[in-house]
Structure formats: C-alpha cells, structure tokens
C-alpha cells in the first residue's frame, strides 16, 4: 500500500523505514542550515524531532531560511518548524524548545534519549557543549561548520574535523576540541575561501553589531540537506 514515504522506502527498504519512524533526532539551530535539515528529516519519516532554537523569524531570514516567510515573521523558529513538520507528517512527534543551548541550560536536557544529534548553531561555546554532551551520552553527532560568505555549494563536503582545511570556524573547533580530548567529529564544511561581503561593515555599524556575514539561499540549505542525508544513511543501516 502506498504511503507518503513509499518512494523513500524503495531505496531504503521497509526495515530501514521502520527504524527511521522509531528514531528520535535532536536538531540544534533551526536557521539557514538547520531548517533544511529538519525539512529533510521530516520528509524522510523520522518519528520524533526535538528542536532547539531561541530565535524568532525576521525579515532578513527570508533569503535563506526555509521556515522564513512574510507570514512567519515574529514566530519562534521552533514553532514555525513544528507547524511545518506536522503539515508534512501529521504523525510526527515534535518537541519544540525555544531555548539557547549553552552550559547554563544544558542540564535541562538528557541526550541519552536521542538516536542522533545535529549541531547547526553558530556559537563556538554552544557547539562545544552539544558535542561534549553527545559524546558523553554515546550518541552520534554531526556538526556544521561555517556557511556564511560563501557562494559555491559544491565545495561542501562531509569529513572528520581533523581533515578540515580553510574554514576558520573548523580551525577554532579543532583546537578547542583537542583541548577537551576530542579528536574525532563528523562535520559538514566548505573548502571555499570566504568572500568579503560588500557594505557589511556599514550595515553592521548602523545596527550596532559586529560585521554581518553575507548569505545565500543555496549554500546553507545544501549544508542542511547534507547533514540530514548523513543522519538518514546512518540510522537506516
């Protein structure tokens, strides 16, 4: 009998689809990268999704974030994601946490309940906390490095953090992870040199912020889809 996942089942098989439907995956960061990861996970039949993001949808998100439309501006990103997931798969269980995951909030959550964890947040402190807690709980984790100021989606690849080059965020993460005794981590990263955004300093100064990275609809989205694809392949084995 046909179902909404019939075409995926043709590739993965019924046993793998059952595993995906029983799986519980946490996604940290539901922005340009994480939003597309969530989309692909939902469309692949993941049964339970836990979403973590403290931010709300804003006008400047529309150029790259799948959850951002003029109708969702002002909504919590996790709430917008929950609505979208249920529109895709009404049977999915979605737990939405509008929190900023960091050392001071980490104790609220038990990572051992997850089958896989995706790190798609921007801050080094938060990323390190997620990765350390995932490893401590013996839960597979995959992390996304920088996607801002890039135009070439074909430069994205999946590798171990120890093999990354060029990406400044990956360099910082390698150093900080080594300090914590972590030498291996599956990541999505780009070999493209970061471009210099035009007029970014002026815009940042006007907003009273640090330099704002440029972004596109396709590089963060491609990274998110790669994250989800790796999770689906691993969970369906």
Show where each model-derived region lies.
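Glycine-rich phosphate/adenylate-binding loop
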Residues: 2, 109-114, 121-126, 136, ...
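Conserved S-adenosyl-L-methionine
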Residues: 42-48, 136
């Amino acid at each position: 009998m046909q179902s909404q996942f019939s075409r995926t089942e043709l590739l993965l098989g019924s046993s793998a689809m059952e595993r995906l439907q029983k799986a519980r995956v946490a996604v940290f960061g539901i922005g340009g990268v994480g939003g597309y990861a969530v989309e692909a996970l939902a469309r692949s039949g993941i049964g339970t999704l836990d979403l973590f993001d403290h931010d709300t949808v804003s006008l400047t998100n529309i150029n790259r974030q799948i959850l951002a439309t003029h109708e969702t501006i002002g909504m919590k990103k996790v709430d917008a994601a929950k609505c979208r997931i249920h529109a895709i798969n009404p049977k999915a269980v979605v737990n939405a946490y509008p929190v900023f995951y960091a050392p001071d909030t980490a104790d609220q959550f038990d990572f051992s309940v997850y089958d896989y964890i995706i790190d798609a947040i921007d801050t080094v402190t938060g990323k390190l906390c997620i990765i350390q807690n995932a490893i401590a709980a013996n839960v597979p984790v995959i992390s996304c490095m920088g996607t801002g100021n890039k135009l070439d989606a074909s430069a994205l690849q999946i590798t171990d953090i120890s093999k990354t080059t060029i990406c400044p965020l990956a360099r910082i993460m390698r150093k900080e992870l080594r300090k914590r005794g972590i030498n291996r981590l599956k990541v999505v990263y780009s070999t493209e040199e970061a471009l210099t955004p035009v007029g970014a300093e002026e815009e940042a100064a006007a907003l009273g912020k640090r330099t704002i990275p440029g972004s596109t609809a396709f590089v963060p989205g491609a990274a998110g889809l790669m994250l989800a694809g790796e999770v689906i392949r691993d969970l369906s084995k």
